[in-house]
Design a protein with these regions (language model features):
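Short glycine-enriched, charge-decorated loop/helix-capping segments at active-site entrances
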Residues: 45-53
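Single conserved hydrophobic/aromatic residue that forms the stacking wall/gate
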Residues: 1-6, 11
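Short, basic and Ser/Thr-rich N-terminal targeting/leader segments
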Residues: 26, 70-74, 84-86, 138-139, ...
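Active-site catalytic loop in hydrolytic enzyme cores
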Residues: 58, 85-173, 189-197
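Short amphipathic alpha-helices and their capping/turn segments at secondary-structure boundaries
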Residues: 14-28, 167-168
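CN hydrolase (nitrilase-like) catalytic-core segments centered on the catalytic cysteine
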Residues: 54-75, 155-211
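Active-site beta-strand/loop signature of hydrolases that rely on acidic residues for catalysis
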Residues: 23-46, 75, 96, 159, ...
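Short beta-strand-to-loop element that shapes/binds the nucleotide-sugar donor at the catalytic cleft/hinge
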Residues: 77-80
Length: 211
């Protein structure tokens, strides 16, 4: 279990690296981490600070270097700057190579969620190129990944809770597995509703839905 409180970058990258190693040792092919796991979801306005954003990319670079020899795909969450905007993203990588960066499409701005203060929606981004950790990689919301013969798509938290979820398009394009990075808080009665939602999304997309 990965804690999502605080912004201790030097601890977070090592913790994530350790979990990726454990996953590889246990024979896992893909490991999914929570939304914004590198910085934590609860950074508040600190998430916009250049120092924190720089540290996040450095942390990703450390993880890439430390897991380069491991035969496992990892999906982590982190804030990413593209152009003049900040996006809540999933980064897909394996053996030191970044395969793509997926921005969150639907940005919640209600109750305890106020992401619109910090993040832009990735809805208008079709497919672009972004440079991270010295690598040029794809950046877009409806990417389909094919690693090791397995086709999969990625969306982030709120993206699943809307009628036109990105995963629907990814499934039509051939995704066999759909991954959702989330950092939703525990609320009384929410778990059962969430379980129903995940089952429904899996049935609608005829895929394995990993949340």
């Amino acid at each position: 279990r990965l804690s999502l409180v605080g912004s201790e970058m030097c601890i977070r990258d090592r913790h994530i690296t350790e979990l990726i190693r454990k996953g590889a040792d246990r024979g896992a092919s893909i490991i999914l981490f929570p939304e914004l796991c590198i910085t934590s979801y609860t950074c508040g306005d600190l998430i916009q600070q250049p120092a924190l954003l720089h540290a996040a990319e450095q942390a990703l670079g450390y993880i890439l270097a430390q897991t380069r020899e491991l035969p496992i795909v990892a999906i982590v969450g982190m804030p990413v700057t593209y152009g003049n905007a900040l996006y809540n993203c999933a980064v897909v990588f394996a053996q030191g190579r970044i395969h793509g960066v997926v921005p969150k499409t639907y940005i919640p701005n209600y109750s305890e969620f106020y992401e619109a203060r910090c993040f832009m929606s990735g809805e208008e981004i079709g497919l672009a190129t972004i440079r991270m950790c010295g690598q040029d990689t794809d950046f877009g919301r409806n990417m389909l990944f094919n690693i090791g013969g397995v086709k999969f798509g990625v969306e982030i938290c709120e993206d699943m809770w809307v009628p036109a979820a990105p995963s629907l398009h990814q499934a039509v394009d051939g995704a066999q597995i759909l991954f959702n990075l989330s950092a939703s808080p525990e609320v009384l009665g929410k778990h059962n509703y969430l379980l129903t939602l995940v089952k429904s999304q899996s049935a609608r997309t005829q895929s394995a839905y990993i949340y």
